[in-house]
């Protein structure tokens, strides 16, 4: 006789376990300093675009 949903429960438990194992890991393989530098550059570009848009909006 089979045990019903035992396979489904084991699958759900394993999926949760795998999700917990990979939760905090990053896939970009950057150091903290590299990540900070990359993020800072992106924010500078974003701020520059915003300032240009504001300047273009006020000069019309």
Curated annotation (Swiss-Prot):
Lineage of source species: Eukaryota, Metazoa, Ecdysozoa, Arthropoda, Hexapoda
Identification of the protein by name: Putative SERF-like protein
Similarity comment text for this entry: Belongs to the SERF family.
One term under GO cellular component: cytosol
Pfam families tied to this protein: SERF-like_N
Entry superkingdom: Eukaryota
Biased composition (Basic and acidic residues): 1-53
Source organism (scientific name): Drosophila melanogaster (Fruit fly)
Segments of this protein annotated with the region Disordered: 1-60
